Amino acid sequence: MTTLNSRDRVLKMFAGEEVDRPPCFSGMGNVTTEGLKALGQKFAATHLDAKMMAAAAASTYKLFGFECAVAPFDLCIEAEAMGCEINVYAHSEDLLYPT
């Protein structure tokens, strides 16, 4: 079998096809503190800026080779769409997901 690229490896795995090796990815959020540090971003701020979201999501692939770039920033989209305000915990240095 030829070596697959990251995209094909993940898609073939989901299709139940043979892959050259198991893909290393998470279907859930995978933003890391190392990625945020490298970008100079705070986790809370990433929830409010599309470019920061994309950069944070891509950082895990760029730094660690994970075969995905998942933006875990949609957790409150339904509530926001209905007019609710979210709390991104801007005061915290921890990785706290909005509520």
Language model feature labels by segment:
Residues M1-T99:
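Catalytic cores of TIM-barrel enzymes
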